[in-house]
Amino acid sequence: MNSSKTSLDAKITDITKKLEALNKEYADSVKKSDELSKLLSKENDNSPASQEAAARHILELKDDLENELENAKLDDISAPTAEQSKKISEIYGKYIEKISKINDASLTSDSLAWKYAIKYDWEIAKGHHDNQLRLLNPTFFYGNASVYPMNAFSNQYGKYGQLPYKQLLANFKEAVQHKIVMSKVYSKMVVNAFVGRLFQEELTKFVEDKSKNEISVADLIESSSLEGNWKEFLKYYATTYYNAATHGLGEDIKELKLYKENKTNEKELSIDARDKGGKIVKLYGLGLTEKDLNQRNVGLGFAEGDATVNGQSMYRQILKMATTSDLTDDQVNNIGYETTKKSAENSKKIANQAADLIVGKGKKWEAKIKYDADGIGPEEIKEETVVIRDEKGNIDIPSFTKWLNDEEFFFGREGSAYWTDTIKNGLKTDPNLKKYVGELTKFDYDQLLTKGNKDAKHGSITNEEFYYGGLSAFKAYEQFKKTTQNYGRKFFANEVPDYDIQTYKFNEREFVGVGAYNSGIKKFMFNVDPYFSLPKWSVTSFANHESMMGHHNQLMYAQKYLSSVGEFGKYKLGNVFHYTSYVEGWALFMEWFGIEAGFYGTPDYDNKDGDLYAMPVDFSTAHGITNFFTAKTEAEVTDDMIQQIKDLHNGVYWNKVAQVNKYENQDKKHAMDAVKLANLLQYQGALNEAQLRNMRLALDTAYHGKGVKGHEDLPAGASINQVREFMKKNSSLGIGDITSESRRYLSYVGQATSYNSGKAVMMDLYTKVQKKLGLTRREFVEKDNHKYVKEFFDALLRNSALPMDALIKSVSAKYGLTVEKK
């Protein structure tokens, strides 16, 4: 009896607790409803309590959406079905309507950023599913802001290996039915990439099999130990999917095969395999031929599609995600084209300054150079004489571009005479480079030094020169870090952890471009291959973009110093946004700020045109890679200063400035002029990198935008070769950079358009805030220990990588700027 009573009492107690919990939940919901009604009313105040309630409601809506997706088992789907995409779109649509009702009057500058960034993120996600991007098997696993078609550029194959292969395969089969198939040129590059990355063991077996001179890609995949469904997916892609293309056919091979001889006369992207002894062996069949390089209409926008979906609508969705704007493909193309043409004139001013340094004020500049017209291609280096400035003072930009691409301006391509045993041993035994020697070993570059490989040709140099050129590039980027990092930190209110430097795996280097920043390991990555790396005069702008103050600073800031709302930081959104237009826009913004901060010389803050990229007024001293040189007169030049400029970047500036004036017994004068040339050319690198991003807007859309009208020198549906020709004529980029970048824009659909989109917004905000504060440009940078620029940078950084509209609203609210209505 007592036992039964005890059991009954326990049940009553339990029921009572549940009723109390339900009553509390009801009371809370009534309170939340009252707060919500107040938030949505136009009469609500902007009190701290109201601000907290609004911030909480934004976060609750975000949580509610995520919970609804999770409960429907739709929260972590990287290969959705048609039905799943439809349901996901409906859920996003419902919550977009809810968050839109929150009244901005209750929001702080931070919660305003949260509201509009979340809303935009949901709109982008809905657009991905409404436009059936699932048929491209894109990178859903990277989040709404980074959904790009399966491609040859980003190293995603390990990630794909963890996905549901059956659904990936089903999506591609459905894509074939809808005629949403990437071009043969595009798809062959994808096959090339995954064969080179996933099947090295099988390639070695093929190399060693003397009875075979060819093998089909399907048979190569079949011979591997990959899991069965993964195997079937890759085989389908390399056979049925590849052959279903109706545009951009190029060589139009019916069965993709690998050959031991170059039967298809391919020009580039031959696969590097190895025999059992480690010797590099070229395999052919998956590289690019002349037909591939000249093929028009190879981009996504030209995928035929049907009544329900087409490549053009898919590209426009990706473009909206990348630029965080509603600009059409034709509008983006025109912006890129016009800014490219306008900026090309800047090089003339730099060429004149360089001419004055090297040959004298106003004199004719004729230079002998060693020039490799096709980079990694079969053509040999040629000695040429170029007239950069004639007797009348006219500058010839193509000749100046050739001079800037002289072999000596590339690490590893200085010529065999440079690579003495003393130089090589000095690099190998330098204690500051010990860890980088280890990096080269770890990523499989030691094979370049083996007896059978070291004297073999790599382009126009040897494999050994390739290796030591890579090691000397490590030295240069380490020197950049040591000379600029502490100065760069002065412009930020919060300090971030240090970064390190790394390269890529040997068998990935042809696909990865010149470099990137890896936030997971806090490392600035660069390509050590002398034919896929940037010239020496781009070291500052490139390294600043990727490291301190660029990507590294922004991404580490997002991990440590994000905003909050309420007392004691009660409400925090966290690091949830990763929009490329912001991430790359910030890095480009910092490239520009290097000019404003004096990395290249004394900034021209007072130029009459208001040109933010204006040439520094004096290149004698700088805060960048030559900040070891503080001398204003020859008497102040020390032996250590002379030695450092002699060694900088393998002596290229010391050598180039002495083309005419040999500086006999004038080492101090020689050093001063070499430093000026180094700073001048690093500034040229900054302008050239800015020009590269101008071109990216035009080139990505020229490849993929079916709605683009085009231009005489850059037509719509441009071929790879047409893109390269445009880059040659409108920049100082090296042939290796042009080669890798032109492949990248075709492969990484839409991504290249993100860079300038974000930078333009940030530079516009910079100028508006400076003027709103009533400060000159110099005061904005320098006054009160950089106080004002620190506060502005914090306003940009404190809410992670926002869509541009949200960033504009947030910064404008903080500084009282007027937001222009769309």
Where are these regions (language model features)?
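N-terminal maturation segment of proteins
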Residues: S3-K822
